[in-house]
From Swiss-Prot:
Residues 7-31 are annotated as: Interaction with Gp41. PROSITE patterns: ZF_CCHC (PS50158). Residues 14-33 are annotated as: Interaction with membrane phosphatidylinositol 4,5-bisphosphate and RNA. The keyword Electron transport does not apply. Pfam families: Gag_p17 (PF00540), Gag_p24 (PF00607), Gag_p24_C (PF19317), zf-CCHC (PF00098). This is Gag polyprotein. One of its GO terms (cellular component) is virion membrane. A motif (PTAP/PSAP motif) lies at residues 456-459.
Length: 521
């Protein structure tokens, strides 16, 4: 521990603790980072004493620099730490790790040239576009040579098949990875697929059918001279009866070249498209937007299913213009119909961006509540006859006394006097029952006229008492009539009938049931 701490001492240790781990970060380097770097050097067979000098750090960087692009996170962290230690030994001020790496790179380029490109190995790389053939076939000194596919390309193809499981993305992925390949390379890609052997068998059947069609359309011309290259058959294009050299010669011969690689790729694409339809049985007519599904998710599913459809581009265009709007949910369909005829996809996505979300539901709820809580419209005639409210406190119209903002009036609101309220005001009119509760008779009765020359010896009779006596006598007579038997009442009616004008039907007939039912009884 002590030896490792002796890598940086005094001012150098202080300089280390001022350098940040990341640009703009809070954490800074500590001595524990040097201890960790010394432990990691043992894994690469390097002595930890190399960290004590600038030259030693430069040797470490020379070893680690080629490994950084493909190295692990620990290797990259070790390289960064050594760069910081090198800057401290070289007295180069750095604020953070990135700045230290830049200074190390500039120094190595200027002095040791270690950051230049590593010398190319025996394996050729892809030529720039326009300078030669495609990547699997290279032109070296005027001759075409074959370069096998890299394991990385094969691994990418296998991962694509395993993850997408013959989705619509497999066909364009195969086209990108097999660009410029020979039938030999394409067969390598197909042989790397371990699972999905049912799909592989479908592809083999398609290859056999296409090879038979090729043989039928391109018959053998006849015997060829010795040393002349034969014409490819269907099995030659499939790579089963031809070598890589023959395939390259057919592809790049000066006269009548046959692109066997492109032809074989087209056969494979036909088989992959059949596999896509088999593994994705969903019809585009069944793609419909859910009631709560965002419009963008629905569009993604729609175009994914449309991509798997192997139809004419005109038919796909019709499906996009018709089915995309027709199969949307009612909320989005209402918005899309307002955009006019043939709107663009960008306009549809922008218009339906918030449809179906909580914000749109809240707006619809607010509009519904606003309509429900709105006052009912009053007809014009009823509005004209409507009485205006008058305040008892201030005497103004338009509000009630409960809503009045003026000071409260004291005393009775009717007469303005104190000592009572309006409900008990003596100046109020009498009700229809007569006198009020205070014992004062109403003043709207006519006064009896007294003849001239006569002086009454007694007080005049009150008209109210006379009317009350008359009503009492009339009620007494009605009670007596109700108590009399039926026979006496009938005799009274008969006597009244004899006194009056005779009519067609007598009272006795009226009292009999025959008056109701006629001759039926």
């Amino acid at each position: 521990m002590g030896a490792r701490n002796s890598v940086l001492r005094g001012k150098k240790a202080d300089e280390l603790e001022k350098i940040r781990l990341r640009p703009g970060g809070k954490k800074k380097y500590r001595l524990k980072h040097i201890v960790w770097a010394a432990n990691e050097l043992d894994r690469f067979g390097l002595a930890e004493s190399l960290l004590e000098s600038k030259e030693g750090c430069q040797k470490i960087l020379t070893v680690l620099d080629p490994l950084v692009p493909t190295g692990s996170e620990n290797l990259k962290s070790l390289f960064n730490t050594v760069c910081v230690i090198w800057c401290i030994h070289a007295e180069e001020k750095a604020k953070d790790t990135e700045e230290a790496k830049q200074k190390v790179q500039r120094h190595l380029v200027a002095e040791t040239k270690t950051t230049e490109k590593m010398p190319s190995t025996s394996r050729p790389t892809a030529p720039p576009s326009g300078n030669g053939g495609n990547f699997p076939v290279q032109q070296v000194a005027g001759n075409y040579t074959h370069v096998p596919l890299s394991p990385r390309t094969l691994n990418a193809w296998v991962k694509l098949v395993e993850e997408k499981k013959f989705g619509a993305e497999v066909v364009p992925g195969f086209q990108a990875l097999s660009e410029g390949c020979t039938p030999y390379d394409i067969n390598q890609m197909l042989n790397c697929v371990g699972d999905h052997q049912a799909a592989m068998q479908i592809i083999r059947e398609i290859i056999n059918e296409e090879a038979a069609d090729w043989d039928a359309q391109h018959p053998i011309p006849g015997p060829l001279p010795a040393g002349q290259l034969r014409e490819p058959r269907g099995s030659d294009i499939a790579g089963t009866t031809s070598t890589v050299e023959e395939q390259i010669q057919w592809m790049f011969r000066p006269q009548n070249p046959v692109p066997v690689g492109s032809i074989y790729r087209r056969w494979i694409q036909i088989g992959l498209q059949k596999c896509v339809r088999m593994y994705n049985p969903t019809n585009i007519l069944d793609i419909k937007q859910g009631p709560k599904e965002p419009f963008q998710s629905y569009v993604d599913r729609f175009y994914k299913s449309l991509r798997a459809e192997q139809t004419d581009p005109a038919v796909k265009n019709w499906m996009t213009q018709t089915l995309l709007v027709q199969n949307a949910n009612p909320d989005c369909k209402l918005v899309l119909k307002g955009l006019g005829i043939n709107p663009t996809l960008e306009e549809m996505l922008t218009a339906c961006q918030g449809v179906g979300g909580p914000g749109q539901k809240a707006r619809l709820m607010a509009e519904a509540l606003k309509e429900a809580m709105a006052p009912a419209p009053i007809p014009f005639a009823a509005a004209q006859q409507r009485r205006t409210i008058k305040c008892w406190n201030c005497g103004k119209e338009g509000h009630s006394a409960r809503q009045c903002r003026a000071p409260r009036r004291q005393g009775c609101w009717k007469c303005g006097k104190a000592g009572h309220i309006m409900a008990k005001c003596p100046e109020r009119q009498a009700g229809f029952l007569g006198l009020g509760p205070w014992g004062k008779k109403p003043r709207n009765f006519p006064v009896a006229q007294i003849p001239q020359g006569l002086t009454p010896t007694a007080p005049p009779i009150d008209p109210v008492e006379d009317l009350l006596e008359k009503y009492m006598q009339q009620g007494k007579r009605q009670r007596e009539q109700r108590e009399r038997p039926y026979k006496e009442v009938t005799e009274d009616f008969l006597q009244l009938e004899k006194q009056e004008t005779p009519c067609r039907e007598t009272t006795e007939d009226l009292l009999h049931l025959n008056s109701l039912f006629g001759k039926d009884q």
